[in-house]
Amino acid sequence: MKPSILEKLQQLGDRLEEVTHLLGQPEATSDMDNYRKLTREHAELTPVVEVFQNYRLAQSDLADAEEMLSDPEMKDFAAEEIEAAKAKIGELDTELQKLLLPKDADDDKNIFIEIRAGTGGDEAALFAGDLLRMYSRYAERNRWQVEIVSANESELGGYKEVIARIIGLGAYSRLKFESGGHRVQRVPATESQGRIHTSACTVAVMPEADELEDIELNPADLRIDTFRASGAGGQHINKTDSAVRITHLPTGMVVECQDGRSQHANKAQAMKVLAARLNDAQKREAQAKEAAERKSLIGSGDRSERIRTYNYPQGRVTDHRINLTLHKLDFVMDGDLAEITNALIAEHQAELLAAMGD
Protein backbone atom coordinates (compact mmCIF):
# COMPACT_ATOMS: atom_id res chain seq x y z
CA MET A 1 0.00 0.00 0.00
CA LYS A 2 1.25 3.50 -0.86
CA PRO A 3 2.66 5.54 2.06
CA SER A 4 0.26 8.38 1.19
CA ILE A 5 -2.74 6.04 1.60
CA LEU A 6 -1.39 4.70 4.92
CA GLU A 7 -0.99 8.28 6.14
CA LYS A 8 -4.55 9.10 5.06
CA LEU A 9 -5.88 6.04 6.94
CA GLN A 10 -3.99 7.04 10.08
CA GLN A 11 -5.54 10.53 9.84
CA LEU A 12 -9.02 8.98 9.52
CA GLY A 13 -8.37 6.91 12.65
CA ASP A 14 -7.36 10.04 14.56
CA ARG A 15 -10.44 11.87 13.29
CA LEU A 16 -12.74 9.02 14.40
CA GLU A 17 -11.32 9.30 17.93
CA GLU A 18 -11.94 13.05 17.85
CA VAL A 19 -15.54 12.67 16.58
CA THR A 20 -16.27 9.96 19.17
CA HIS A 21 -15.01 12.31 21.89
CA LEU A 22 -17.15 15.22 20.59
CA LEU A 23 -20.28 13.04 20.46
CA GLY A 24 -19.68 12.00 24.06
CA GLN A 25 -19.74 15.57 25.38
CA PRO A 26 -22.82 16.62 27.43
CA GLU A 27 -23.42 19.63 25.13
CA ALA A 28 -23.21 17.54 21.92
CA THR A 29 -26.97 17.70 21.29
CA SER A 30 -27.31 21.44 21.92
CA ASP A 31 -26.65 22.07 18.20
CA MET A 32 -28.70 19.38 16.43
CA ASP A 33 -27.42 20.25 12.93
CA ASN A 34 -23.82 19.79 14.07
CA TYR A 35 -24.79 16.67 16.03
CA ARG A 36 -26.31 15.11 12.89
CA LYS A 37 -23.18 15.96 10.87
CA LEU A 38 -20.94 14.37 13.49
CA THR A 39 -23.17 11.28 13.69
CA ARG A 40 -23.05 10.91 9.90
CA GLU A 41 -19.26 11.37 9.89
CA HIS A 42 -18.90 8.77 12.65
CA ALA A 43 -20.96 6.28 10.62
CA GLU A 44 -18.81 6.92 7.52
CA LEU A 45 -15.45 6.67 9.32
CA THR A 46 -16.16 3.59 11.47
CA PRO A 47 -16.10 0.89 8.72
CA VAL A 48 -12.91 2.35 7.19
CA VAL A 49 -11.07 2.45 10.52
CA GLU A 50 -12.25 -1.06 11.45
CA VAL A 51 -10.91 -2.52 8.19
CA PHE A 52 -7.64 -0.61 8.66
CA GLN A 53 -7.28 -2.09 12.16
CA ASN A 54 -7.76 -5.58 10.67
CA TYR A 55 -5.18 -4.71 7.99
CA ARG A 56 -2.59 -3.77 10.64
CA LEU A 57 -3.43 -6.93 12.60
CA ALA A 58 -2.80 -9.03 9.47
CA GLN A 59 0.54 -7.25 8.96
CA SER A 60 1.47 -8.04 12.56
CA ASP A 61 0.53 -11.71 11.99
CA LEU A 62 2.75 -11.75 8.90
CA ALA A 63 5.71 -10.32 10.82
CA ASP A 64 5.26 -12.92 13.60
CA ALA A 65 5.08 -15.76 11.07
CA GLU A 66 8.22 -14.56 9.29
CA GLU A 67 10.09 -14.60 12.61
CA MET A 68 9.07 -18.25 13.11
CA LEU A 69 10.73 -19.26 9.83
CA SER A 70 14.11 -19.40 11.55
CA ASP A 71 12.85 -22.21 13.83
CA PRO A 72 13.23 -25.55 11.91
CA GLU A 73 10.37 -27.15 13.88
CA MET A 74 7.98 -24.28 13.04
CA LYS A 75 9.05 -23.78 9.43
CA ASP A 76 6.10 -25.55 7.72
CA PHE A 77 3.55 -23.98 10.04
CA ALA A 78 5.15 -20.55 9.54
CA ALA A 79 4.99 -20.91 5.75
CA GLU A 80 1.24 -21.62 5.94
CA GLU A 81 0.71 -18.65 8.26
CA ILE A 82 2.68 -16.37 5.92
CA GLU A 83 0.58 -17.44 2.93
CA ALA A 84 -2.68 -16.89 4.86
CA ALA A 85 -1.55 -13.48 6.17
CA LYS A 86 -0.48 -12.29 2.71
CA ALA A 87 -3.84 -13.35 1.23
CA LYS A 88 -5.67 -11.54 4.03
CA ILE A 89 -3.58 -8.39 3.53
CA GLY A 90 -4.36 -8.44 -0.20
CA GLU A 91 -8.12 -8.71 0.45
CA LEU A 92 -8.09 -5.94 3.05
CA ASP A 93 -5.94 -3.70 0.83
CA THR A 94 -8.55 -3.93 -1.96
CA GLU A 95 -11.39 -3.35 0.51
CA LEU A 96 -9.66 -0.26 1.93
CA GLN A 97 -9.09 1.20 -1.52
CA LYS A 98 -12.80 0.77 -2.29
CA LEU A 99 -13.75 2.42 1.00
CA LEU A 100 -11.47 5.35 0.16
CA LEU A 101 -13.01 5.92 -3.27
CA PRO A 102 -14.55 9.39 -3.57
CA LYS A 103 -18.18 9.29 -2.49
CA ASP A 104 -20.90 10.58 -4.79
CA ALA A 105 -22.63 13.26 -2.72
CA ASP A 106 -25.94 12.33 -4.38
CA ASP A 107 -25.84 8.60 -3.60
CA ASP A 108 -28.21 8.68 -0.62
CA LYS A 109 -30.77 10.93 -2.31
CA ASN A 110 -34.27 10.26 -3.59
CA ILE A 111 -34.60 10.25 -7.37
CA PHE A 112 -36.81 11.29 -10.23
CA ILE A 113 -36.93 8.66 -12.95
CA GLU A 114 -38.15 9.81 -16.33
CA ILE A 115 -39.17 7.23 -18.95
CA ARG A 116 -39.90 8.34 -22.52
CA ALA A 117 -41.21 6.16 -25.33
CA GLY A 118 -38.96 6.39 -28.38
CA THR A 119 -39.07 4.52 -31.68
CA GLY A 120 -41.84 1.98 -31.92
CA GLY A 121 -45.03 3.98 -31.37
CA ASP A 122 -47.66 2.20 -29.26
CA GLU A 123 -45.33 -0.72 -28.57
CA ALA A 124 -42.69 1.67 -27.19
CA ALA A 125 -45.34 3.25 -24.94
CA LEU A 126 -46.33 -0.20 -23.64
CA PHE A 127 -42.68 -0.96 -22.94
CA ALA A 128 -42.37 2.36 -21.06
CA GLY A 129 -45.17 1.05 -18.82
CA ASP A 130 -43.28 -2.24 -18.38
CA LEU A 131 -40.12 -0.35 -17.37
CA LEU A 132 -42.07 1.74 -14.87
CA ARG A 133 -43.46 -1.45 -13.32
CA MET A 134 -39.96 -2.98 -13.26
CA TYR A 135 -38.52 -0.01 -11.34
CA SER A 136 -41.58 0.14 -9.07
CA ARG A 137 -41.20 -3.55 -8.17
CA TYR A 138 -37.47 -3.00 -7.55
CA ALA A 139 -38.36 -0.09 -5.26
CA GLU A 140 -40.81 -2.34 -3.36
CA ARG A 141 -38.05 -4.91 -2.84
CA ASN A 142 -35.95 -2.16 -1.26
CA ARG A 143 -38.91 -0.80 0.75
CA TRP A 144 -38.79 2.51 -1.09
CA GLN A 145 -41.86 4.58 -1.95
CA VAL A 146 -42.92 5.42 -5.51
CA GLU A 147 -44.97 8.48 -6.49
CA ILE A 148 -46.14 9.26 -10.02
CA VAL A 149 -45.29 12.92 -10.66
CA SER A 150 -46.45 13.26 -14.25
CA ALA A 151 -47.88 10.81 -16.77
CA ASN A 152 -48.76 11.16 -20.45
CA GLU A 153 -50.63 7.94 -21.17
CA SER A 154 -51.02 6.40 -24.61
CA GLU A 155 -54.41 5.27 -25.89
CA LEU A 156 -53.50 1.56 -26.01
CA GLY A 157 -51.96 1.59 -22.53
CA GLY A 158 -48.49 2.42 -21.34
CA TYR A 159 -46.95 5.89 -21.44
CA LYS A 160 -45.59 8.30 -23.99
CA GLU A 161 -43.75 9.84 -21.04
CA VAL A 162 -43.89 9.24 -17.31
CA ILE A 163 -41.98 10.74 -14.38
CA ALA A 164 -41.89 8.95 -11.03
CA ARG A 165 -40.30 9.97 -7.74
CA ILE A 166 -38.64 7.17 -5.80
CA ILE A 167 -38.16 7.93 -2.12
CA GLY A 168 -35.63 5.89 -0.18
CA LEU A 169 -32.11 5.98 1.22
CA GLY A 170 -29.61 4.99 -1.47
CA ALA A 171 -32.09 5.12 -4.36
CA TYR A 172 -29.72 7.14 -6.52
CA SER A 173 -26.69 4.96 -5.72
CA ARG A 174 -28.53 1.83 -6.91
CA LEU A 175 -30.30 3.23 -9.97
CA LYS A 176 -28.02 5.98 -11.33
CA PHE A 177 -26.60 3.69 -14.03
CA GLU A 178 -30.08 3.06 -15.51
CA SER A 179 -29.92 6.27 -17.56
CA GLY A 180 -29.72 5.62 -21.29
CA GLY A 181 -31.46 3.80 -24.13
CA HIS A 182 -33.42 0.62 -23.35
CA ARG A 183 -34.36 -1.55 -26.36
CA VAL A 184 -37.02 -4.25 -26.43
CA GLN A 185 -37.41 -7.06 -28.97
CA ARG A 186 -40.72 -8.91 -28.86
CA VAL A 187 -43.89 -9.82 -30.75
CA PRO A 188 -46.52 -7.12 -30.04
CA ALA A 189 -49.99 -8.26 -28.96
CA THR A 190 -51.38 -6.56 -32.08
CA GLU A 191 -49.01 -8.43 -34.45
CA SER A 192 -50.96 -11.16 -36.26
CA GLN A 193 -47.99 -12.49 -38.27
CA GLY A 194 -45.88 -13.25 -35.20
CA ARG A 195 -43.08 -10.95 -36.31
CA ILE A 196 -40.62 -9.59 -33.75
CA HIS A 197 -40.63 -5.80 -33.46
CA THR A 198 -37.89 -3.63 -31.98
CA SER A 199 -38.89 -0.63 -29.87
CA ALA A 200 -36.98 1.68 -27.57
CA CYS A 201 -37.37 3.92 -24.54
CA THR A 202 -35.07 6.44 -22.93
CA VAL A 203 -34.60 6.44 -19.16
CA ALA A 204 -33.21 9.39 -17.19
CA VAL A 205 -32.40 9.02 -13.48
CA MET A 206 -31.88 12.29 -11.60
CA PRO A 207 -31.13 12.87 -7.90
CA GLU A 208 -33.69 15.04 -6.16
CA ALA A 209 -32.21 18.46 -5.38
CA ASP A 210 -32.07 19.35 -1.67
CA GLU A 211 -34.96 21.76 -1.10
CA LEU A 212 -33.92 23.68 -4.22
CA GLU A 213 -30.59 24.48 -2.54
CA ASP A 214 -28.47 22.53 -5.00
CA ILE A 215 -29.56 24.74 -7.87
CA GLU A 216 -30.59 28.39 -7.90
CA LEU A 217 -33.80 29.13 -9.79
CA ASN A 218 -34.19 32.77 -10.74
CA PRO A 219 -37.94 33.58 -10.95
CA ALA A 220 -37.17 35.82 -13.95
CA ASP A 221 -35.95 32.72 -15.83
CA LEU A 222 -39.27 30.90 -15.39
CA ARG A 223 -42.52 31.03 -17.33
CA ILE A 224 -45.36 29.36 -15.47
CA ASP A 225 -48.54 28.37 -17.31
CA THR A 226 -51.62 26.62 -15.96
CA PHE A 227 -54.01 24.39 -17.89
CA ARG A 228 -56.63 21.73 -17.34
CA ALA A 229 -55.40 18.29 -16.39
CA SER A 230 -56.42 15.56 -18.80
CA GLY A 231 -56.38 11.78 -18.87
CA ALA A 232 -55.53 9.32 -21.63
CA GLY A 233 -56.93 10.34 -25.01
CA GLY A 234 -57.27 13.94 -23.90
CA GLN A 235 -60.52 13.72 -21.95
CA HIS A 236 -60.73 16.30 -19.17
CA ILE A 237 -60.72 14.87 -15.70
CA ASN A 238 -61.35 18.15 -13.87
CA LYS A 239 -62.70 21.58 -14.65
CA THR A 240 -60.07 23.75 -13.00
CA ASP A 241 -56.69 24.85 -14.32
CA SER A 242 -54.79 22.73 -11.79
CA ALA A 243 -52.10 21.41 -14.15
CA VAL A 244 -48.87 23.39 -14.28
CA ARG A 245 -46.28 23.84 -17.01
CA ILE A 246 -42.96 25.51 -16.12
CA THR A 247 -40.56 26.61 -18.85
CA HIS A 248 -36.95 27.40 -17.94
CA LEU A 249 -36.25 30.15 -20.48
CA PRO A 250 -32.41 29.99 -20.55
CA THR A 251 -32.34 26.27 -21.41
CA GLY A 252 -35.80 25.73 -22.92
CA MET A 253 -36.50 22.89 -20.46
CA VAL A 254 -40.22 22.28 -19.95
CA VAL A 255 -41.79 20.42 -17.03
CA GLU A 256 -45.49 19.58 -16.77
CA CYS A 257 -47.23 18.23 -13.67
CA GLN A 258 -50.93 17.42 -13.45
CA ASP A 259 -51.20 14.44 -11.12
CA GLY A 260 -51.27 16.46 -7.88
CA ARG A 261 -54.50 17.36 -6.08
CA SER A 262 -54.08 21.10 -6.56
CA GLN A 263 -52.32 23.73 -8.64
CA HIS A 264 -50.07 24.47 -5.65
CA ALA A 265 -49.05 20.80 -5.34
CA ASN A 266 -48.39 20.52 -9.07
CA LYS A 267 -46.29 23.69 -9.10
CA ALA A 268 -44.20 22.49 -6.13
CA GLN A 269 -43.62 19.13 -7.78
CA ALA A 270 -42.78 20.72 -11.15
CA MET A 271 -40.23 22.99 -9.46
CA LYS A 272 -38.60 19.94 -7.88
CA VAL A 273 -38.40 18.13 -11.22
CA LEU A 274 -36.99 21.22 -12.95
CA ALA A 275 -34.35 21.67 -10.23
CA ALA A 276 -33.42 17.98 -10.56
CA ARG A 277 -33.16 18.25 -14.36
CA LEU A 278 -30.95 21.35 -14.23
CA ASN A 279 -28.79 19.76 -11.53
CA ASP A 280 -28.58 16.59 -13.61
CA ALA A 281 -27.56 18.50 -16.75
CA GLN A 282 -24.64 20.07 -14.87
CA LYS A 283 -23.67 16.69 -13.41
CA ARG A 284 -23.77 14.95 -16.81
CA GLU A 285 -21.58 17.64 -18.36
CA ALA A 286 -18.97 17.03 -15.66
CA GLN A 287 -19.32 13.24 -16.03
CA ALA A 288 -18.86 13.45 -19.79
CA LYS A 289 -15.58 15.34 -19.31
CA GLU A 290 -14.33 12.81 -16.75
CA ALA A 291 -15.44 9.85 -18.87
CA ALA A 292 -13.65 11.23 -21.93
CA GLU A 293 -10.47 11.59 -19.88
CA ARG A 294 -10.53 8.02 -18.54
CA LYS A 295 -12.47 6.37 -21.42
CA SER A 296 -15.19 5.27 -19.01
CA LEU A 297 -18.03 3.01 -20.13
CA ILE A 298 -20.05 3.32 -16.94
CA GLY A 299 -21.41 6.59 -15.61
CA SER A 300 -20.62 8.69 -18.67
CA GLY A 301 -24.08 10.25 -18.45
CA ASP A 302 -24.67 9.73 -22.19
CA ARG A 303 -28.45 9.37 -22.63
CA SER A 304 -28.21 8.62 -26.34
CA GLU A 305 -26.21 5.45 -25.68
CA ARG A 306 -28.08 2.14 -25.95
CA ILE A 307 -27.30 0.48 -22.66
CA ARG A 308 -29.56 -2.58 -22.52
CA THR A 309 -31.62 -4.94 -24.68
CA TYR A 310 -34.61 -6.96 -23.46
CA ASN A 311 -35.19 -9.90 -25.82
CA TYR A 312 -38.52 -11.58 -25.03
CA PRO A 313 -38.39 -14.56 -27.47
CA GLN A 314 -35.06 -15.63 -25.94
CA GLY A 315 -35.94 -14.59 -22.36
CA ARG A 316 -32.70 -12.65 -22.33
CA VAL A 317 -31.47 -9.32 -20.93
CA THR A 318 -28.12 -7.93 -22.10
CA ASP A 319 -26.35 -4.91 -20.64
CA HIS A 320 -24.04 -3.78 -23.43
CA ARG A 321 -21.72 -1.66 -21.27
CA ILE A 322 -20.38 -4.61 -19.27
CA ASN A 323 -21.30 -7.46 -21.66
CA LEU A 324 -23.57 -9.00 -19.05
CA THR A 325 -26.28 -11.37 -20.33
CA LEU A 326 -28.89 -12.90 -18.03
CA HIS A 327 -31.42 -15.50 -19.15
CA LYS A 328 -34.07 -14.54 -16.62
CA LEU A 329 -36.06 -11.79 -18.32
CA ASP A 330 -39.28 -12.50 -16.39
CA PHE A 331 -37.50 -12.02 -13.06
CA VAL A 332 -35.79 -8.81 -14.22
CA MET A 333 -39.06 -7.32 -15.47
CA ASP A 334 -40.55 -8.16 -12.06
CA GLY A 335 -37.94 -5.95 -10.39
CA ASP A 336 -35.13 -8.45 -9.76
CA LEU A 337 -32.41 -5.99 -10.77
CA ALA A 338 -29.87 -6.67 -8.02
CA GLU A 339 -27.52 -8.77 -10.17
CA ILE A 340 -27.42 -6.04 -12.84
CA THR A 341 -27.08 -3.08 -10.47
CA ASN A 342 -24.38 -4.85 -8.41
CA ALA A 343 -22.37 -5.64 -11.55
CA LEU A 344 -22.60 -2.03 -12.77
CA ILE A 345 -21.54 -0.65 -9.38
CA ALA A 346 -18.60 -3.11 -9.24
CA GLU A 347 -17.47 -2.09 -12.75
CA HIS A 348 -17.71 1.59 -11.83
CA GLN A 349 -15.63 0.99 -8.70
CA ALA A 350 -13.03 -0.89 -10.77
CA GLU A 351 -12.79 2.09 -13.13
CA LEU A 352 -12.32 4.48 -10.20
CA LEU A 353 -9.66 2.21 -8.66
CA ALA A 354 -7.82 2.08 -11.99
CA ALA A 355 -7.96 5.87 -12.17
CA MET A 356 -6.53 6.09 -8.62
CA GLY A 357 -3.62 3.89 -9.68
CA ASP A 358 -2.74 6.04 -12.69
From Swiss-Prot:
It is found in: Cytoplasm. Pfam families: PCRF, RF-1. GO terms for cellular component: cytoplasm. The modification N5-methylglutamine is found at Q235. Disulfide bonds: none annotated. Keywords: Cytoplasm, Methylation, Protein biosynthesis. Methylated by PrmC. Methylation increases the termination efficiency of RF1. It comes from the Bacteria. One of its GO terms (molecular function) is translation release factor activity, codon specific. NCBIfam families: prfA (TIGR00019), PRK00591.1 (NF001859). HAMAP family: Rel_fac_1. Belongs to the prokaryotic/mitochondrial release factor family. Peptide chain release factor 1 directs the termination of translation in response to the peptide chain termination codons UAG and UAA. This is Peptide chain release factor 1. It comes from Neisseria meningitidis serogroup A / serotype 4A (strain DSM 15465 / Z2491).
